[in-house]
Amino acid sequence: MSMQDPIADMLTRIRNGQAANKVAINMPSSKLKVAIANVLAAEGYIESVKVLEGAKPELEITLKYFQGKPVVESIQRVSRPGLRIYKRKDELPKVMGGLGVAVISTSKGVMTDRAARQAGLGGEIICYVA
């Protein structure tokens, strides 16, 4: 049986990995997953991102902790296969009053809500991270 929502699976693996104090987590790789992971790494929510080549490429994410606690307090899927959520540039949400990040898929690639607002782009809201 195929996976219905691979992005939700990725976010759940990050959440579970940090709850179990794992150093790194592995998952099947895709271009969108790598783009989301790169945004999270650039924002400082995860340590590093690596794509392991092979018959089936795997994405390895090294998780980040601060004083023994996970850096990611909450990670929540917004737009899902059954209900896509799109917002215009002036409707983009601020997560936790600007302390968190909304990951958005735009026509210019995957970026944060701040970067999308700056570029004047709207798009599909993939997830909220705080």
Swiss-Prot record:
A GO term from the CC aspect: cytosolic small ribosomal subunit
PROSITE patterns for the chain: RIBOSOMAL_S8
Domain of life: Bacteria
Gene3D superfamilies (UniProt xref): 3.30.1370.30, 3.30.1490.10
UniProt cross-references to Pfam families, sorted A to Z: Ribosomal_S8 (PF00410)
Sequence intervals crossing the membrane: none
UniProt keyword terms in alphabetical order: Ribonucleoprotein, Ribosomal protein, RNA-binding, rRNA-binding
GO molecular function: rRNA binding; structural constituent of ribosome
GO biological process terms held by the UniProt record: translation
InterPro entries: Ribosomal_uS8, Ribosomal_uS8_CS, Ribosomal_uS8_sf
Chain's role: One of the primary rRNA binding proteins, it binds directly to 16S rRNA central domain where it helps coordinate assembly of the platform of the 30S subunit.
Family as reported in the entry's similarity comment: Belongs to the universal ribosomal protein uS8 family.
PANTHER family: 40S RIBOSOMAL PROTEIN S15A (PTHR11758)
Subunit structure: Part of the 30S ribosomal subunit. Contacts proteins S5 and S12.
Protein name, entry field: Small ribosomal subunit protein uS8
Organism: Haemophilus influenzae (strain ATCC 51907 / DSM 11121 / KW20 / Rd)
Taxonomic lineage: Bacteria, Pseudomonadati, Pseudomonadota, Gammaproteobacteria, Pasteurellales
Gene: rpsH
